[in-house]
Amino acid sequence: EKHARLDKTTTIYSPHVIILEGIFALHDQRVTDMLDMKIFAEADADLCLSRRILRDVRERGRDIEGCVKQWFAFVKPNFHKFVEPQRMVAEQTDIIVPRGIENKVAISMVSDQILKTLHHKSRLHQLELKRLGKVAENNPLSRNVIIVQHTNQIRGINTLLMNPEIDREDFIFYFDRLAVMLVEHGTDAGMRYKPFVVDTPVPGRQYRGLQLDGEPSAIVILRGGSCLETGLKRVLPDCRTGRMLIQTNYRTGEPELHFHSIAPDISEHNCVLLLDPQMSSGGAALMSVRVLLDHGVPQDRIVFVTYMAGKNGLNRLMTVYPAIKVVVCRIVEDMEFRWVESKYLGC
């Protein structure tokens, strides 16, 4: 519809395959350097002319004579000058596909190569996660990891939560109490304040206190993060809340972002709380922080709030993003399955 550049850009996460299509797709060396496969789809000039006439007459209300004049005056000469050289340069084209969709052999070759490339990239990503795990395995926890002090109250709540015979209603009640404490620790760790003076009920007396310096917000990592949302609303009733759905591909172990709803001005917020009750390998946490960074949120304004986390997962997260803060209640085995959300949500 629009043959012009637009100021707005869209960030795409977790795609398996991105197709860049256009007559100048292989023209710029900076673009071709980022491509895994470069395909030139070849078609007969007469076929291209007939398609163009049909499109312009049917959809744009033009006449046939004007289409033919434009073809010979501008389109065809510029094709031979700018587009066809992309076909001739070996460095710019991996495969030339004649006859378009009718060429079943070429399509099969392309799909086979795509599968091989995806498998190779998946292996590289898994190796990188393992490398991060080995680097972080023996490292001490970062100072930005805040472990909630285990008072008698918290130890008692943990005892109830860890009991498999507890009723779901009681589990929700006590987990919500603990969620309030976790969110309070998160606000203490990440929010910025400014001096503020109020007049007290006593005439002539003032109280010099603090006021939030900006708007806080939270991102709930679905589906487990919804377990902490009740605690969030009790601490910050009017807090703006976004959503992310990140799931781990069980075949490859890679996190995949399926959905996100984030405030457009989140980069200006005082503090952003990321809520997820459990962290194991840290893959979903890494991706969620990456998404916030892509939306302009500085690392030092991100606080990851979780009930339990594996040490290696924490160290992976802090190795990649050392300036964020993490609030955690319990440190557990790295591969503990996600049972909290199942117990809380009842499914």
Predicted segments with their positions:
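ATP-dependent NMP and nucleoside kinases share a basic, alpha-helical "lid"
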Residues: R5-R58
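NTP-dependent small-molecule kinase module
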Residues: Y13, L54-V57, K76-I146
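PRPP-associated nucleotide enzymes
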Residues: K116-C347
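ATP-dependent small-molecule kinase phosphotransfer cores
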Residues: E1-V17, R62-A73
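Catalytic phosphate-donor-binding core of small-molecule kinases
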Residues: I64-C67, A73-P77, I302, G310-N315
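Short gly/ser/thr-rich secondary-structure transition/capping motifs
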Residues: E1-A4, I18-I23, A73-P77, F196-V202, ...
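Conserved acidic residues
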Residues: H16-V17, L35-D36, D94, P216, ...
